[in-house]
């Protein structure tokens, strides 16, 4: 999604009154992905707050590298969950949400901004917040791409959608998502996903889920409760779609046990939510009702009238042409009321995963005669706005149209749209607000960026995402009243920020002395007698007068004049709040005025602060330690787990590398007392890196920091290796050799005995062999510390029999595998010559597939087409695999091994061998923790 490229540079910046510049050493490039470990030396010291010089952190040049021991958000199969123990979970400190659920203003106090909004309808968003079930860092990484959702004001409950038969079925939300949601007053649910058989579902998993102990307890339910309470989220979404097989059918007994499971869960944890998906009926059939009916009513209320689940998400087909005349939502509301169920505990499902706001919905089936809705609304995959976008700006644009409306103004009238056109969620849902108590501080941060700004100065070019430090965004996106001759529009901006990576920007033209007003926030804030109210802004094009316009609870509107105009540099404007002490603020707007005509105005908002004077304390960090460190095999990149103590909770903990010149380079910002540094580049030859953690409060004041030193492994000597594109060839054939020497290699020397060029230098060399024979090849890696040789004896076979090139031997070969998902993904599809079909095996790795070539042949290469070659995500490409050959099918010899692949297609040439059987062992099936092997084709030559 990144749409700009910045060159590597290191510029020292001081955030004192004057900026001073200096040069620092830039890091090295390169590095492999095979993890290696070494001892670390930890030296902790306390550093007092002082003026710091900041070296501009360079861009991450190795985004594809992920260290093996990166902390990971959790996921389990049911039986695995039973073995989970928080006390021994090394990732626990990274996976716990630390942001409490914010209290929102009461519904009856909310103000509607258009004629179709109502206060009763709830909304549930089932969203893909991370692209896969596994491999998700708890608090982001040094990448900008992330679903940094920003329309929380329209959501009451977020379901963190995940689960797959190849990774895990029980998926708690990652803590960064919970933190962002809680900050906005949104409840978050994890997912319990029982997939259909076609998607790898197994009845044994459902049986594991529903196991009941002799004492009447349900062990998996107890674990679900423990996970939610330990990690700090509000409950679970139950998605049971495993329909069974003829041999293992789904029955009414499963349905009854599911109801009992849910009741037990609610008895043990009444404060946690459990939402049931309209799928399995009470008679044990997979029969989506698309409504509340007698077939699924028992999942909400038992025959005895006892409550079961808290709510139900209704399937999507109530709006289809075939079911429209049944008015299923109207009937659902009626049946709910008859049984003492709040109709707004039913969520009418709308599937927008494929088409987003282009999805046609018969909204009249959702709307009732009183101007409200029959049920609440459930959106499946509003994450479409992110996954279908090619730039971050397009993501914001699509998100705005999806959640607000096509006019980008929640106060706009959408009645003129046709019945099936997308009206925007703001047409039904009144905006919620968590602004109910001081302090209120926003830096307009979306939780990601292409760089990081501190007090308005750019201190890092490192891409980043961490939704845990996202801010509360404007409630109204956007309501602007332009004065005569003015034309301003609003959006988010990644080019500049006050703190974080984004700001709010207004662009357009203004007439002299003519005001425009932008309404930003709904609130229910009582002004304290010592309240500080400031706004950081900057204007390009002219100076701007920026007055605050506050609507009060009694309906009056107060305009507070700023103490200074806004110029081209970040300006912190203060407002005197003495006239509103003790009064309740209902909305926050700004009046913008220019003293001259201006076109091309750019007005950025970087921070709004409302807090009681002296209410923010400064934290002190201590006990900073390196919990764990690992290094790539070249010792050029590190993955580092840091943890520390803090005497009081800080809003932010800034993590820096301390450079040799004592300047600081920002590595990231955390809201917890731990942080993971991924792919930290080695920047010098001292074999040490010092880190500093600086606590920062909501007023952006620094507390006392702490430092620690980590040791790097000695990687002074290079490592030598190489590969050839062909190892079996005819005389005179050009063969290309590629160096696989380590990144610290300065010179690569080659020896080709018997070739037309017998010695050479360079990363890549092409030679030919004029005579038939078997030849060895040697490479020497050289740097200032010394040299290392690697020789492969008998590596090249030259024969006239290869004059017509390599022959494909494997198409249609016999196959045997240790596992496969179903008959549509059986092992024979790996040799059918079609890259749109695959062999897929689930369960714990490694996975094996063996090809029978029918007779003994000379084999010298195997091409493998991984997930990406078949159209799947590159994250699903096989990372580690081994190729073995055999003449008898019993005794196998390893001929090739890969530990760090990221490519969708791999060519693996090795010393020619006589073999009938070729075995592929998939050791690490994906780039993350997904254990499903996906091989679209294997070609043996």
What positions do the PLM features span?
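Chitinase-like catalytic core of GlcNAc-active glycosidases
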Residues: 116-328, 898
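Extra-cytoplasmic beta-strand recognition segments
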Residues: 158, 504, 516-548, 573-577, ...
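Short carbohydrate-recognition loop motifs
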Residues: 486-516
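Aromatic, loop-rich ligand-recognition surfaces of beta-strand-rich domains
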Residues: 523, 535-537, 610-612, 831-894, ...
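Conserved aromatic anchor
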Residues: 637-649
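Beta-strand-rich modules
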Residues: 677-704
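Extracellular/lumenal mature domains of secreted and surface-exposed proteins
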Residues: 692, 704-801
């Amino acid at each position: 999604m990144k749409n700009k490229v910045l060159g590597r540079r290191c510029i020292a910046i001081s955030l004192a009154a004057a900026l001073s510049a200096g040069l620092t050493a830039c890091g090295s490039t390169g590095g492999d992905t095979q993890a290696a470990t070494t001892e670390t030396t930890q030296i902790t010291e306390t550093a007092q707050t002082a003026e710091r010089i900041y070296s501009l952190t360079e861009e991450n040049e190795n985004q594809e590298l992920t260290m093996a021991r990166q902390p990971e958000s959790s996921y389990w199969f049911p039986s695995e969950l039973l073995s989970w123990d928080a006390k021994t979970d090394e990732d626990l400190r990274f996976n716990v949400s630390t942001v409490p659920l914010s209290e929102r203003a009461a519904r009856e106090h909310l103000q509607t901004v258009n004629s179709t909004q109502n206060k009763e309808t709830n909304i549930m968003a089932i969203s893909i917040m991370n692209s896969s079930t596994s491999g998700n860092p708890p608090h982001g990484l040094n990448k900008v791409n992330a679903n940094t959702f920003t329309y929380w004001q329209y959501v009451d409950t977020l379901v963190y959608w995940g689960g797959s038969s190849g990774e895990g079925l029980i998926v708690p939300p990652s803590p960064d998502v919970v933190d962002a949601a809680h900050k906005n007053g949104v409840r978050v649910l994890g997912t319990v996903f029982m997939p259909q058989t076609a998607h790898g579902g197994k009845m044994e998993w459902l049986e594991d889920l529903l196991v009941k102990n002799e004492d009447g307890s349900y062990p998996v339910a107890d674990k679900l409760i423990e996970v939610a309470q330990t990690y700090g989220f509000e409950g679970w979404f139950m998605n049971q779609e495993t329909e069974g097989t003829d041999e293992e059918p789904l029955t009414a007994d499963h349905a009854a046990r599911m109801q009992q499971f849910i009741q037990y869960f609610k008895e043990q944890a009444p404060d946690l939510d459990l939402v049931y998906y309209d799928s399995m009926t009470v008679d044990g059939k997979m029969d989506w009702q698309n409504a509340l009916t007698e077939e699924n009513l028992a999942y909400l209320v038992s025959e005895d009238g006892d409550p079961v689940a808290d709510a139900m998400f209704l399937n999507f087909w109530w709006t289809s042409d075939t079911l429209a005349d049944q008015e299923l939502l109207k009937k659902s509301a009626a049946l709910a009321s008859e049984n003492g169920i709040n109709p707004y505990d039913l969520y009418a499902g709308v599937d927008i995963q494929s088409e987003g706001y282009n999805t046609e919905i018969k909204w009249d089936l959702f709307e009732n005669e009183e101007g409200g809705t029959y049920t609440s609304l459930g959106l499946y995959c509003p994450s479409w706005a992110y996954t279908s976008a090619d730039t971050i700006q397009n993501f914001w644009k699509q998100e705005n149209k999806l959640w607000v409306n096509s006019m980008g103004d929640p106060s706009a009238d959408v009645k003129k749209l046709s019945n099936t056109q997308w009206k925007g969620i703001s047409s039904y849902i009144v905006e919620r607000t968590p602004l109910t108590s001081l302090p209120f501080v926003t830096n307009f941060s979306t939780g990601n960026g292409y760089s990081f700004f501190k007090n308005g100065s750019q201190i890092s070019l490192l891409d980043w995402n961490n939704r845990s430090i996202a801010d509360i965004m404007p409630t109204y996106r956007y309501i602007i009243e332009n004065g005569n001759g003015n034309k301003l529009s609003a959006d988010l901006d990644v080019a500049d920020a006050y703190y974080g990576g984004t700001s709010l920007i207004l662009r357009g033209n203004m007439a002299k002395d003519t005001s425009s007003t932008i309404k930003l926030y709904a609130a229910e804030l009582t002004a304290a007698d010592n309240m500080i109210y400031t706004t950081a802004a900057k204007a390009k094009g002219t100076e701007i007068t920026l007055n605050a316009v506050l609507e009060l609870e009694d309906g009056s509107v107060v305009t507070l004049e700023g103490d200074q105009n806004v110029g081209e540099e970040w300006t912190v404007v203060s407002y005197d709040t003495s006239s509103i002490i003790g009064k309740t603020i209902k909305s926050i707007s700004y009046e913008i005025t220019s003293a001259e005509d201006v076109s091309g105005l750019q007005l950025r908002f970087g921070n709004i602060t409302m807090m009681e004077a002296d209410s923010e304390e400064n934290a002190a960090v201590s006990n900073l330690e390196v919990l764990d460190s690992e290094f790539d095999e070249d010792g050029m990149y590190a993955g580092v787990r840091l943890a520390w103590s803090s005497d009081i909770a800080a809003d932010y903990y800034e993590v820096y590398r301390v450079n040799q010149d004592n300047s600081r380079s920002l590595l990231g910002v955390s809201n917890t007392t731990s942080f993971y540094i991924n792919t930290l580049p080695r920047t010098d030859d001292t074999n040490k890196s010092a880190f500093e953690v600086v606590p920062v409060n909501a007023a952006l004041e620094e507390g006392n920091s702490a430092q620690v030193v980590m040791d790097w492994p000695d990687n002074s000597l290079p490592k030598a290796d190489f590969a050839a594109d062909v190892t079996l060839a005819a005389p005179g054939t050009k063969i290309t050799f590629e160096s696989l020497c380590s990144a610290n290699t300065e010179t690569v020397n080659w020896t080709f005995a018997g070739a037309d060029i017998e010695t050479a230098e360079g990363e890549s060399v092409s030679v030919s062999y004029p005579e038939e024979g078997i030849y060895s090849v040697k490479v020497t890696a050289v740097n200032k510390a010394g040299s290392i040789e690697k020789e492969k004896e008998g590596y090249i076979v030259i024969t006239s029999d290869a004059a017509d090139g390599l022959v494909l031997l494997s198409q249609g070969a016999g196959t045997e595998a240790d596992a496969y998902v179903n008959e549509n993904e059986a092992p024979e599809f790996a040799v059918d010559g079609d890259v749109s079909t695959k062999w897929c095996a689930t369960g714990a790795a490694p996975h094996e597939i063996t090809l029978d070539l029918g007779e003994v042949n000379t084999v010298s290469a195997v091409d493998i087409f991984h997930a990406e070659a078949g159209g799947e995500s590159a994250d699903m490409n096989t990372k580690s695999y081994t190729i073995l050959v055999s003449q008898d099918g019993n005794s196998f010899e390893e001929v090739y091994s890969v530990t760090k692949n990221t490519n969708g297609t791999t060519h693996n040439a090795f010393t020619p061998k006589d073999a009938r059987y070729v075995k592929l062992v998939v050791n690490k099936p994906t780039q993350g923790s997904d254990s499903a092997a996906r091989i679209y084709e294997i070609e043996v030559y």
